[in-house]
Amino acid sequence: MRVTTTDTLFAGLLATSFEKFRGDYPDIKLEVVISNQVHSLSKREADVAIRPTGNPPETLVGRKVGVIRQSVYGQRHYWQNRRAPLDTLTGHQWIGPDTHMGNRALETWMARKGLNDVCNYRVDSMLGMQTAIRAGDAVTVLPDYLGENDSSLCRLTDSIAELDIPLWILTHPDLKRVKRIREFTKVIGEELRQALVYA
């Protein structure tokens, strides 16, 4: 079974869940395609897609397994677990998404908050942004499932509701009755649902 997902989801949530699934279902072979590019399930480039999206393609079937929430994070040593109102963070350096990352919601939010003036460092992946803030006093927006599980970081704000994005597990309609696909989407869907509740 070929599964496609993003690097951030794989590193932050799925690697552990996939390993558990492999232990419980040793006869199902997993091939994981880690890419921020959307692979075509209709062309059978993958059997299952696990993707954050507000608008899943109508040609696919699946279910929303939760909502990815995002907050502002900073390096724990520098911030010492201090919460800060967002408006006070505009005086600090920000790390933002590069346009090639394709995170239009975050780009728009940062522009609307006037944060582009204090953002002189841009990275084209969430994992890159996470790594970059570990090195200094800058702040950035990260999915809570990444930031909360990184002991070197601390959350500085509440979750930013306008950056919430649904997480979907999707497959081609012709595959939805295939037993291994049903088992995988059921088990991994439940794991993700639980993980996102606590993130």
How does the language model describe each region?
Residues 40-43, 55-167, 193-199:
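C-terminal regulatory
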Residues 2-4, 49, 95, 140, ...:
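Short, well-ordered beta-strand segments
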Residues 167-177:
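A bilobed periplasmic-binding-protein/Venus flytrap-type ligand-binding module shared by bacterial periplasmic
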Residues 1-58:
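Central regulatory/effector-binding core of bacterial HTH transcription factors
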Residues 8, 128, 183:
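Residue-level recognition of oxygen-bearing side chains
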Residues 176-190:
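Short amphipathic alpha-helical coupling segments at ligand-binding clamshell hinges
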Residues 6, 75, 172:
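Residue-level recognition of the GNAT/N-acetyltransferase active site
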